[in-house]
From Swiss-Prot:
NADP(+) binds at residues 84, 133-137, 157-162, 220, 244. GO terms for cellular component: cytosol. Involved in the biosynthesis of the chorismate, which leads to the biosynthesis of aromatic amino acids. Catalyzes the reversible NADPH linked reduction of 3-dehydroshikimate (DHSA) to yield shikimate (SA). It catalyses: shikimate + NADP(+) = 3-dehydroshikimate + NADPH + H(+). The lineage of its organism: Bacteria, Pseudomonadati, Pseudomonadota, Gammaproteobacteria, Alteromonadales. GO terms for molecular function: NADP binding; shikimate 3-dehydrogenase (NADP+) activity. Shikimate binds at residues 21-23, 68, 93, 109, 222. It is an enzyme of class 1 (oxidoreductase). This is Shikimate dehydrogenase (NADP(+)). NCBIfam families: aroE, PRK00258.1-2. Its EC number is 1.1.1.25. Pfam families: SDH_C, Shikimate_DH, Shikimate_dh_N.
Length: 279
């Protein structure tokens, strides 16, 4: 579709609900830092009309969008082109409207996770990693984790068949395996909780033996206080606990880089969000 010259390029995040989204603040801060001229808004898409909502946005100078729950799988189906990461994740959180009007989909969730792990831990090479959960958040994280240089990824899930299905998808990309969640006995260097258990104050049913003094525990959830998973990990002597706020900012930075071809700094935005969260 033809573009109108000299207009501020529009970006947005689509979700339902969407009022809680921090994406407009994050991308506005990224734009200011990098000297980019753009607008970024939150769009509440009807549950049964995401495609129509996005296409209307694209037809009105929409250049790109983030996608959050519950539309990531619908966004995947909407795309004319997919990155390898999006293809394997089976979900899209970043849409780009190309010059010829085609829609390209990417998934930056796992990139945000790995970037935050590296920001906190440095080199990930050689680490033994346990991933709890086999839903969309887990699936979007497997390839970036395997590409990060870790020694081995073990996936556990309440329903083991789902964990085994993920292993089948990614087995050719690195050393990845699954275990019954009740059979995990050894300690790990990094344990990642990709489930939403902390939102209800619960902890996945894994053995305390998975945690040693050197273990880093990472919860994709975040809040004003430590998450239930991270509190549990601390009580068992985990060496470090990290919540998912940095992952949120990291995935946004990866999306911004795809659209604008410039990589913004994560730290100032993360510090601002953390200050507001605990303030």
């Amino acid at each position: 579709m033809a573009r109108v010259e000299n207009m501020t390029e529009r970006y947005a995040v689509f979700g339902n609900p969407i009022g809680h989204s921090k994406s407009p603040k994050i991308h506005t801060m990224f734009a200011k830092e990098t000297g980019q001229s753009l607008s970024y808004e939150a769009i509440l898409a009807p549950i049964d009309a995401f495609e129509a909502s996005f296409k209307e946005f694209a037809a009105n100078e929409g250049y790109g969008a983030n996608v959050t729950v519950p539309f990531k799988e619908q966004a995947f189906s909407l795309c004319d082109e997919l990155s390898e990461q999006a293809q394997l994740a089976g979900a899209v959180n970043t849409l780009s409207v190309l010059a010829d009007g085609k829609i390209r989909g990417d998934n930056t969730d796992g990139l945000g996770l790995v970037a935050d792990l590296k920001r906190n831990l440095g080199d990930l090479c050689g680490l033994q990693v346990l991933l709890i959960g086999a839903g969309g958040a887990a699936r979007g994280s497997v390839l970036p984790l395997l590409h990060s240089g870790i020694a081995k990824l073990t996936i556990v899930n309440r329903t083991q068949a789902k964990a085994e299905a993920l292993v089948e998808i990614f087995t050719s990309y690195g050393d990845v395996t699954s275990l019954p969640i009740t059979h995990v006995g050894q300690s790990y260097d990094v344990i990642i909780n990709s489930t939403s258990s902390s939102l209800s104050g619960e902890v996945p049913n894994i053995s305390p033996d998975t945690i040693a003094p050197h273990t880093v525990c990472y919860d994709m959830m975040y809040g004003k206080q430590s998450t239930a998973f991270n509190l549990w990990a601390k009580s068992l002597g985990a060496g470090q606990t990290i919540d998912g706020l940095g992952m949120l900012v990291g995935q946004a930075a990866a999306s911004f880089s795809i659209w604008r071809k410039v990589t913004p700094s994560v730290e100032p935005v993360l510090a601002q969000l953390r200050s507001e969260l605990i303030g």
